[in-house]
UniProtKB/Swiss-Prot annotation:
Gene3D superfamilies: Isopropylmalate Dehydrogenase. Catalyzes the oxidation of 3-carboxy-2-hydroxy-4-methylpentanoate (3-isopropylmalate) to 3-carboxy-4-methyl-2-oxopentanoate. The product decarboxylates to 4-methyl-2 oxopentanoate. Its cofactor is Mg(2+); Mn(2+). The gene is leuB. HAMAP family: LeuB_type1. Homodimer. InterPro entries: IsoCit/isopropylmalate_DH_CS (IPR019818), IsoPropMal-DH-like_dom (IPR024084), Isopropylmalate_DH (IPR004429). It catalyses: (2R,3S)-3-isopropylmalate + NAD(+) = 4-methyl-2-oxopentanoate + CO2 + NADH. This is 3-isopropylmalate dehydrogenase. One of its GO terms (molecular function) is 3-isopropylmalate dehydrogenase activity.
Length: 359
């Protein structure tokens, strides 16, 4: 029997709740398809601050490195906001990405037919949306040096540096074009080349990569226009390629096309090593412990893990289809209750319904 080692990082807020549901579902799926998943839960984010004093302990890093994949729920809580930046949960996430060289963030956004009414946009605008945001994840302004805050005679001055090298742009562009080749063969590169030198390099390198993919249509949009187009005509996009900061913002805009950020999975990948699979949403501490969180983004992240990291494509498709069936049956968590339905369920009940479908 094939066996896989998965590191679980439940993190903070609703993280443990959606992790518990996903763990149980993956156990069912693995048994049904004849493989084994060995899970190891490790502290990360706020939970690691509580246990180890830092958001990303070395023991967690080593466990991640020795895994076939990492399944992360969510991190962050306002109670850690007064800590020095290097000790906050968010810094642990940045360190995870850099330590595993997770340079490629893949965020699919696809409208589930039964949820078209959940979107804040009209049905006709969103019903054909099927796009992927490919975001560079380990460079750009979040990692650039110098950065900091200094005292001046005019008060405090704060600064960050946005930087990219040709190699960094090249490798993320390759990911986007290869992905587009499997889809509708369109890449839209998003930058701010009319203002930023770093974006001019981004555009030049993307064009160079595109020369190797003659069958792929490459277009360019400035980030402000891309944000508008995502709301105005989202179905025009296939693969959106962009940098760290712009991708962070655009992927959250794209997330709301589905009606809830609780629906969207993501994968953060490297060329050689374990990937990290996580929902796009945050830790939602305001609803933690109430059993009302939407576990679907976490479950779809698990499906991405099955497909990409473990090559268990049949199992991944089976899980995705079961999730769609539950939604088609009218079951909704509270974040989706703008749709007319009487079948509101909580996090654990959504997991139980899905488990019944999988048997």
């Amino acid at each position: 029997m094939k066996s896989y080692k998965i590191t679980l990082l439940p993190g903070d807020g609703i993280g443990p709740e959606i992790t518990n549901v996903t763990h149980k579902i993956l156990d069912l799926v693995s048994r049904k398809f004849g493989f084994e998943i060995k899970f190891k839960e490790m502290p990360f984010g706020g939970s690691a601050i509580d246990s180890d004093g830092i958001p990303f302990p070395d023991r967690t890093l080593q466990e991640c490195k020795n895994s076939d994949a990492v399944l992360l729920a969510a991190i962050g809580d306002p109670k850690y906001d007064e800590l020095p930046r290097e000790k906050r949960p968010e810094t642990g996430l940045l360190n995870l990405r850099s330590s595993l060289d997770l340079f490629a963030n893949i965020r699919p956004v696809k409208i589930i037919p039964s949820l078209t009414k959940a979107s804040s946009l009209k049905e006709d605008f969103v019903k054909e949306v099927d796009l992927v945001v490919v975001r560079e994840l380990t460079s750009g302004i979040y990692f650039g040096e110098p950065k900091g805050r200094i005292k001046t005679d005019k008060g405090e001055r704060a600064f960050n540096t946005m930087t990219y090298t040709s190699e960094e742009v090249n490798r993320i562009a390759e990911i986007a074009f290869k992905l587009a080749k499997q889809r509708n063969q369109k890449v839209c590169s998003v930058d701010k080349a009319n203002v930023l030198d770093v974006s001019q390099l981004w555009r030049e390198e993307t064009i160079l990569v595109s020369n190797k993919y003659k069958d792929i249509e490459l277009t360019h949009q400035y980030v402000d226009n891309a944000a508008m187009q995502l709301v105005r005509n989202p179905s025009q996009f296939d693969v959106i390629l962009t940098g760290n900061l712009f991708g962070d913002i655009l992927s959250d805009i794209a997330a709301m096309l589905t009606g809830s950020i609780g629906m969207l999975p993501s994968a953060s990948l490297t060329t050689d090593g374990p990937g990290v699979f996580e929902p796009v949403h945050g830790s939602a501490p305001d609803i933690a412990g109430k059993d009302i969180a939407n576990p679907i983004a976490m479950l779809l992240s698990a499906a991405m893990m099955l497909k990409i990291a473990l090559n268990e494509t049949e199992a991944a498709t089976f899980l995705e289809n079961a999730i769609n069936e539950i939604l088609n049956d009218g079951y909704r968590t509270s974040d989706l209750m703008s749709i007319q339905t009487t079948k509101q369920v909580g996090c654990s009940q959504m997991g139980e319904l899905l488990a019944e479908k999988l048997k």
